[in-house]
Amino acid sequence: MYDDLIEQCHLSMERKSKLVDKALNKLESTIGQSRLSYLPPEIMRNII
């Protein structure tokens, strides 16, 4: 029972990580030379 729950949680976190990565890639392409481009990736991930 716990193994299934852990597996589902792991899959959910992987999907979330992929979505955040896609969003970051889109943001990076649209941000360009704005001030947001100076933020470290960790902060951008927290914002998303």
From Swiss-Prot:
- The superkingdom listed in its UniProt entry is Viruses
Instruction: Name one matching Pfam family.
Output: PRANC
Q: Which InterPro entries match?
A: PRANC_domain
Give any extra note attached to this record. Answer: Encodes the C-terminal region of the G3R protein of variola virus.
Describe the family membership recorded for this protein in Swiss-Prot or TrEMBL: Belongs to the orthopoxviruses G3R protein family.
Listed name of the protein: Uncharacterized protein VACWR005
Phylogenetic classification of the source organism: Viruses, Varidnaviria, Bamfordvirae, Nucleocytoviricota, Pokkesviricetes
